[in-house]
From Swiss-Prot:
Heme binds at residue 449. This is Cytochrome P450 monooxygenase poxM. The keyword Ligase does not apply. The chain crosses the membrane at residues 15-35. The keyword Transferase does not apply. Induction: Expression is positively regulated by the oxaleimides biosynthesis cluster-specific transcription factor poxB. It comes from Penicillium oxalicum (strain 114-2 / CGMCC 5302) (Penicillium decumbens). Its EC number is 1.-.-.-. Belongs to the cytochrome P450 family. PROSITE patterns: CYTOCHROME_P450 (PS00086).
Length: 512
């Protein structure tokens, strides 16, 4: 009995010794890892933030904060054009690097971190295999052809008119009075969500006027906080830690996944009843050239989810940013208002085509807003393939990630003089090669945004309609901000601008 009691009393001591030994070995391992990454690692020669050179958790922290795009820019200001932003990652901020990494023929593929985002099956966002991606993109391209986009315009116009009608409540004020302040970020979120839902699924969720489905938009934003962290540090999923750290994001993801599942199911059920084609119908009817296969239900759902998120957010952020900069730049605002109002004699004339394309200053304002406040401003990481790659004159061996911080290169003064100045005229010079060479709000090359043409049409039509109908201004007395700030959580989380509107009266006929 005494021996048993002695063993029981000594057990905690033995456990403590074991834990101490294990902790010592673990500490020694961490110390060795830090020394290796700082001194002996193949990328040790490159400067960068100290914590970033040691651990991916540095980037993950800034992704969680939503300022990773600005932090990459700050690091470039301190360390130069090439920085080691994570132990196995190099970031650049030059036009040459944009071409080297994202241009056609670059010896890179999507980073392995995108595997972390795969849910059921890979989609065009997460596919790493170049051949598979090219095949899927060919299937999807039919839904974004010029002919398809032209056929979608009436639906887009109808929803834009709904937004314009809601910006000023009729009879709420005299013609010459300013409206109540409107936070435009949610308005543009509702508009673009309704547009993409209509164009993809022929669905009418009417978030512009009804609360019911607005929770889906909030769920997307919440879900993307976790996604942005995983893209920087997949290790966060170890022991399912992300489930505890990002419980709200998980709830948002589940809510959005259920929405997509039910929406796709409803869309499939009514396939034979639709008179007009939508993007989903193009996906259903298109087949891969290689084997004649069309997309299955999981693939259709995955692509639809990506399009809803990317298609809604990119355009909403573009619209909000452009309105912000116009409201802060009186001279430019008056010039673009004059351009739009002289170009169109009536609201009915505002359509996609040569007349709208003639509004060159309006288009330049959109491009400049995308330059200053890109919807996704951090780096799109690419893994170097066998044989390595030379980026901006520096050779990077196989297996490491390279990328260009979009916000950082968009604010590089060697490409864009006075980069924090809203200057749409930089896009109106005869030769725009230099400014275009580093411009990548929609990415570049084979991985560029497939819906770029649709997004540009939406932005031009929306802004032209608003400007033709209304004067607008920032709320008097508000603080003047030099830049439209975004939180980079894969997509751009945003607030504002808060604007007031006033109807334009033409020949005693009220517009609005």
């Amino acid at each position: 009995m005494n021996a048993l009691i002695g063993q029981l009393l000594n057990a905690p001591v033995a456990l403590l010794k074991g834990a101490t030994i294990a902790l010592s070995f673990f500490s020694l391992y961490l110390f060795g890892l830090v020394i290796y990454r700082l001194i002996f690692h193949p990328l040790a020669q490159y400067p960068g933030p100290l914590l970033g050179r040691i651990t991916n958790l540095y980037a993950a922290y800034h992704a969680w904060k939503g300022d990773i795009h600005e932090d990459i820019w700050r690091c470039h200001q301190k360390h130069g054009n090439c920085i080691r932003y994570a132990p196995d990652r190099l970031a650049f901020d030059t036009a040459k690097a944009v071409s080297d990494i994202y241009g056609y023929g670059g010896n890179v593929r999507k980073s392995q971190v995108y595997d972390t985002l795969v849910h059921r099956t890979a989609n065009t966002l997460t596919m790493r295999d170049k051949k598979q991606h090219a095949q899927r993109r060919r299937i999807m391209s039919h839904g974004f052809s010029d002919a398809a986009i032209r056929s979608f315009e009436p639906r887009v116009q109808e929803l834009i008119q709904t937004l314009c009608d809601l910006l000023i409540v009729k009879d709420a004020s005299a013609d010459s009075e300013w409206s109540a302040p409107q936070d435009m970020a949610p308005w543009f979120d509702y508009l673009t969500f309704d547009i993409m839902s209509s164009l993809i699924f022929s669905a009418s969720y009417d978030t512009l006027r009804q609360e019911k489905y607005r929770s889906v938009i909030r769920a997307i934003e919440e879900s993307n906080v976790r996604v942005s962290v995983l893209l920087q540090a997949p290790i966060v999923t170890l022991f399912r830690s992300d489930k505890k750290l990002f419980s709200q994001s998980i709830l948002g993801r589940n809510h959005f996944t259920r929405f997509i599942g039910s929406t796709v199911k409803e869309r499939v059920q009514k396939s034979k009843l639709l008179a007009d084609r939508d993007i989903f119908s193009y996906f259903q009817s298109s087949k891969a050239a290689a084997n004649g296969d069309s997309m299955n239900m999981n693939e259709l759902s995955g692509e639809a989810a990506t399009l809803i998120v990317a298609g809604s957010d990119t355009t909403a952020t573009t619209l909000a940013a452009t309105m912000f900069y116009l409201s802060q730049s009186a001279d430019i605002y008056h010039r673009v208002a004059q351009e739009v109002r002289q170009c169109f004699n009536s609201e009915d004339e505002i359509h996609a085509g040569s007349q709208l394309n003639a509004c060159r200053l309006l288009r330049a304002c959109i491009d400049e807003a995308l330059r200053m406040s890109p919807p996704a401003g951090s780096a799109l990481w690419r893994e170097v393939e066998a044989g390595g790659i030379t980026v901006n004159g520096r050779f990077v061996p196989e297996g490491y990630d390279v990328g260009v911080g979009i916000y950082a290169v968009h604010h590089n003064p060697t490409v864009y003089p006075q980069p924090f100045r809203f200057d749409p005229d930089r896009w109106l010079v005869d030769d725009t090669h230099d400014v275009r060479s580093a411009f990548m709000p929609f990415s570049l090359g084979t991985r560029s945004c497939i819906g770029k043409g649709l997004a540009q049409m939406e932005a031009l039509l929306t802004l032209a309609n608003i400007i033709w109908r209304y004067d607008f201004r920032a709320v008097p007395g508000g603080a003047v901000q030099p830049e439209y700030k975004l939180k980079d959580h894969v997509t751009g989380a945003k607030t504002g601008p808060v604007l007031q509107y006033r109807r334009i009266v033409r020949d005693k006929i009220m517009i609005g």
